Amino acid sequence: MSLSFCGNNISSYNIYHGVLQNPCFVDALNLVPHVFLLFITFPILFIGWGSQSSKVQIHHNTWLHFPGHNLRWILTFALLFVHVCEIAEGIVSDSQRASRHLHLFMPAVMGFVATTTSIVYYHNIETSNFPKLLLALFLYWVMAFITKTIKLVKYWQLGWGMSDLRFCITGVMVILNGLLMAVEINVIRVRRYVFFMNPQKVKPPEDLQDLGVRFLQPFVNLLSKATYWWMNTLIISAHRKPIDLKAIGKLPIAMRAVTNYVCLKEAYEEQKKKAADHPNRTPSIWLAMYRAFGRPILLSSTFRYLADLLGFAGPLCISGIVQRVNEPKNNTTRFSETLSSKEFLENAHVLAVLLFLALILQRTFLQASYYVTIETGINLRGALLAMIYNKILRLSTSNLSMGEMTLGQINNLVAIETNQLMWFLFLCPNLWAMPVQIIMGVILLYNLLGSSALVGAAVIVLLAPIQYFIATKLAEAQKSTLDYSTERLKKTNEILKGIKLLKLYAWEHIFCKSVEETRMKELSSLKTFALYTSLSIFMNAAIPIAAVLATFVTHAYASGNNLKPAEAFASLSLFHILVTPLFLLSTVVRFAVKAIISVQKLNEFLLSDEIGEDSWRTGEGTLPFESCKKHTGVQSKPINRKQPGRYHLDNYEQARRLRPAETEDVAIKVTNGYFSWGSGLATLSNIDIRIPTGQLTMIVGQVGCGKSSLLLAILGEMQTLEGKVYWNNVNESEPSFEATRSRSRYSVAYAAQKPWLLNATVEENITFGSSFNRQRYKAVTDACSLQPDIDLLPFGDQTEIGERGINLSGGQRQRICVARALYQNTNIVFLDDPFSALDIHLSDHLMQEGILKFLQDDKRTVVLVTHKLQYLTHADWIIAMKDGSVLREGTLKDIQTKDVELYEHWKTLMNRQDQELEKDMEADQTTLERKTLRRAMYSREAKAQMEDEDEEEEEEEDEDDNMSTVMRLRTKMPWKTCWWYLTSGGFFLLFLMIFSKLLKHSVIVAIDYWLATWTSEYSINDPGKADQTFYVAGFSILCGAGIFLCLVTSLTVEWMGLTAAKNLHHNLLNKIILGPIRFFDTTPLGLILNRFSADTNIIDQHIPPTLESLTRSTLLCLSAIGMISYATPVFLIALAPLGVAFYFIQKYFRVASKDLQELDDSTQLPLLCHFSETAEGLTTIRAFRHETRFKQRMLELTDTNNIAYLFLSAANRWLEVRTDYLGACIVLTASIASISGSSNSGLVGLGLLYALTITNYLNWVVRNLADLEVQMGAVKKVNSFLTMESENYEGTMDPSQVPEHWPQEGEIKIHDLCVRYENNLKPVLKHVKAYIKPGQKVGICGRTGSGKSSLSLAFFRMVDIFDGKIVIDGIDISKLPLHTLRSRLSIILQDPILFSGSIRFNLDPECKCTDDRLWEALEIAQLKNMVKSLPGGLDATVTEGGENFSVGQRQLFCLARAFVRKSSILIMDEATASIDMATENILQKVVMTAFADRTVVTIAHRVSSIMDAGLVLVFSEGILVECDTGPNLLQHKNGLFSTLVMTNK
């Protein structure tokens, strides 16, 4: 065919009747605007434009949008689509002519290029903010509009109309060019860049003036929005450097929690006003959410409708293409000047291109719908969290204290209910999109197959409710699993906390068995869960097969015609479309029900009682300054700062005379006060008190008399039934601690009775938002005796404490809370029983240095609630409480004069406290606390050191490697871990899973191939009605086999996952429980517990479905590629570049997704912790009036979590858009190849069907790969513990060789003993030699770290004995099996450990002893009467950790436990360190009598306790330096023992 612009006919070039009368020259005229634009713009684009000064200097170049920006992009895309149609129409028309007529499509091609150039040119001009250069575009649109109008008029003159496609295309282009011209005119009008002296200046949006904003979706152009092109930089950079919070920056203002909170709050307040007019109505949160977030949901729904409608283009185009391929080739070419729309759409190539464009648009709209709903859901969640937090800060204290609103309920609202509503919003568009999709699908099926299609639709509709039933059962099974999992974790936690005792008593197997029993119950529930999960997967796969089988079999026998390929494969595609919404229906309904329940809970919470607006909060109702100047009877005296630690009322007069004169003002006054906790009954009644300004007021009384309630009532935490609380104005001119300091008018510092700490550093807990002043900070820490404790912490006062940090003792926590109150720059300080958790030394120091010196010298008003009556001598004012009322108020002298009985009662109580003081002086609690903290720090430092060394090694390796190596490591899938997980499920199940999966997908491919053969056979060879029994039978058998294999594969995967989970947990538990004690010393408890909780949960419930989905989607994609290649081998040529593109997409996405997932997870915990710690410390926060600061912190944490989740969602959209576009390219390639190279219509239909399938599953392959990579991290963590070396439980002696009653005598010989904790550590005992006679009482002492406890551990082989030996009753303990050795000895540890269960279980977990023996042990331990008084006696309940017993009782239970064993050797490892003297005396007495004939080795906490021992061993730095009786050692005045005795006096 010859090539020419107007064809070979000479008349085509005739312009005799005028140029415009020649169609070819009119088409040539249309080239002029395009050539003009290309000629003008290309030099500007490639050479550069404008001066640099005209460009906006900002880090984001996408912010500037000229007027009509989005409209321009939409119109340009529409114009490009019309140009494609024009090109296609021209090519199809040209193909019907004898010679080539370039004018039919060449102008359209140039138009397409010019339009593309126009939008590129516009984008560059826009980002450079140089609008003057847009004049070229204005001229282009004017010229294009004119030329297209001339062409349209010419067609109209020829008599063409709406039935002619070319006329329609030209008309649409005239409209589009005209609209684009109008857009340019509007830009000129608004920006005033042409013919105006002062062009408009444009400022960047407020968001992008902040360099921290990195989320650019709202600011980029439409193309970048649709394709998430702006995400490329972040996702690609993840290979070089992990994505951190700095990389993702901050949220734009419109997406921040505070912005959405204001929006939702206004809508909710409007609903509250409407509800106020109707008493029985509550404000509707649903309507509030609709008002606030309805618009984006409607936009998302519109996108969804468009996507769903475009989704039906696939089946229709498949039908059209297969029909065209099936038609016999007609060699006679019918010439026509123009094509109709019907003729145009009958062209197979046109249909292929339209299918490609429809897929692109469908997937773009679908991802846009997903993004808008996710963004709206995130915004809703942020707003709800802010609303909940705002309510928490105003929540009535009685709601929390009286149990109406628990901390768990608040945490559920935050962690569960808000997420339920967010997920419901994600699924919302499905509610109204699904009915349209189902109706459209059924109508199209009916048009294709007639009434037989209704049979298949009926099968789907009837079977779909089963999915809802399965989903309900899944939820029940999950709840049951959670309950068992909680119980298992509780037991595991107990094991880990008491692991030292379990090992020493050789009880590991008993407790391990208990955990295994609970695990079996959990696994039973997991089996149910796995079964229903398998059924759900089975239903998803089997229902489409069943529907297709029913439809085609019905059609084969009920219809009068054979099944054609076009009908068959279009129907298959429609069935896949129809099944999806019906399956989603159950999920949407389930989430809708959950959302309704969540809204009910949220509404109840938001309508719950709030705290009253008291005068001290609002600044109103204050007591006039003048009326406060009433004499309070207080006489001023100086303080004796060097007063001893005992206080007597007899010294009162002397103490009072020493206090300087102070102001007589009243700081707080309560008149006729009646206060309640919300029940309506007054907890405090008839309260008339006054608190003098600048003085120390003490509130005293019996436990439960209302002292703490009085403080809280003054703070406004209680409900005021009657009366008033007045707060005095503050005299700002008073001298203060700092000359430059100014105090808040109603500022209060408050230390609660129950210490409350933030999850923050020690410094942040003390300063509590106030500016840091080093001098003041040091004074406070010294006053609270905190510096020695801070010095023990690994990072000093920068160490994080609280839930996520170091666990401090009660006393240490209490002192930090008191330090916080002291540090604050407030006029008034409330201290609620600050001495309760402190020993006498600390209490005395805090009273002297903290309260009397630091606070009183600063003339601050101090209100102190205390039981320590010995401090009453320092009180300026005393309030005595009894049964919720004020018993007495006044100075101590007033009370002594007016109420002698009360005064004498106080003196009696003080004498008792003095007696207890003598005992407490010996039982130094602070020393014990610091020792415990030191041990914890040692363990953490050791672990941290190991981790630091590992990190340093990794860093060195990373530095040595080049960038490509780092990228390779970041992108590498953990295949080794995957294989290890798969083999944990058993090789048989692994083989069965692989085999069944391959067989199932082979059968599914066979079903489709059989259908292709069936339809092709009868459509070609026998167009009439034929006997189809053979094909129907074969099709039915294959479908039945496919359904059966769907069930087998789903069950196999779940069962393999369950088996792997069972084996991994079993191995982990046994490895941990048999691990060396050193492992538990150096590994934080939370880290080990995390393996049994979060990691085990991932292995149990998350990996199996991910693995199933990954294998299914991968095999579907591979089978699709295989079938397409089989149908059209030419496709393989295009497969290579598509495969390369897919490889790089998944490679970059997996790394970025993993980082963003970790960021999302890591930012959730601080947010949840902030909510829980706010609820716990509500009274303190409100007392300090720090609500605003805490709100701001909550908003920051919410935004941080939201930005991480938003980026993760955007990354998922980035992936799905690209894989969807790749899928569309595969469809286009397959279509073109099928049309050009295949004459078998069945295979063409099959190839196109599988090509459409790929678009659905490509992104799932990558998503599942990314998820599996993250989840395999849990397996890797578990595996890291499984490689740990266990203790060597075997010995050279067989257990049967050990005498039954060994050790019977209790003789111990220590020969040159050397001990260390690990091979790479220094010895802790060096060449120790000692001999202990049978039945001898031995005392071991030494300074901290001298090796005392190490020796006790050596008896049980808990440490590495690398030299020397210990011989007990003639047997070297190194030869004994560990279980035998440990089961024959007894030990009582410093920390008394009891386990949850019964008293019987704690004494005899092996159930070997009779009740008489147990009662005998309890009687010896002085516990028999107490246990008898308990309900159940020996079977009485022991709570976790034995918390329902005192520390002393717990230690006595441990003694009884040791006696039950009746070992001839008892070791007491500082067993009396944590108990008082009275309990210690009982313990020593019992040991001397009950163990009179046994060997007792006592490691002394107090040297005085071993003075009467038959032998005393004194250690120093791991060496035995002294060995003799106590009296003999005391004779050596310079000896270590003598020094220790003198020190402890």
Swiss-Prot record:
The chain crosses the membrane at residues 31-51, 73-93, 102-122, 133-153, 168-188, 302-322, 348-368, 421-441, 453-473, 529-549, 569-589, 987-1007, 1031-1051, 1124-1144, 1242-1262. Gene3D superfamilies: ABC transporter type 1, transmembrane domain (1.20.1560.10), P-loop containing nucleotide triphosphate hydrolases (3.40.50.300). ATP 2 binds at residues 1342-1349. It is found in: Membrane. Residues 52-72, 123-132, 189-301, 369-420, 474-528, 590-986, 1052-1123, 1263-1545 are cytoplasmic. Residues 668-908, 1308-1542 form the ABC transporter domain. Residues 1-30, 94-101, 154-167, 323-347, 442-452, 550-568, 1008-1030, 1145-1241 are extracellular. SMART domains: AAA (SM00382). Expressed at high levels in heart, skeletal muscle and ovary. Moderate levels are found in brain, tongue and pancreatic islets. Low levels are found in lung, testis and adrenal gland. Expressed at very low levels in stomach, colon, thyroid and pituitary. The keyword Glycoprotein applies. Subunit of ATP-sensitive potassium channels (KATP). Can form cardiac and smooth muscle-type KATP channels with KCNJ11. KCNJ11 forms the channel pore while ABCC9 is required for activation and regulation. Can form a sulfonylurea-sensitive but ATP-insensitive potassium channel with KCNJ8. This is ATP-binding cassette sub-family C member 9. It comes from Rattus norvegicus (Rat). The lineage of its organism: Eukaryota, Metazoa, Chordata, Craniata, Vertebrata.
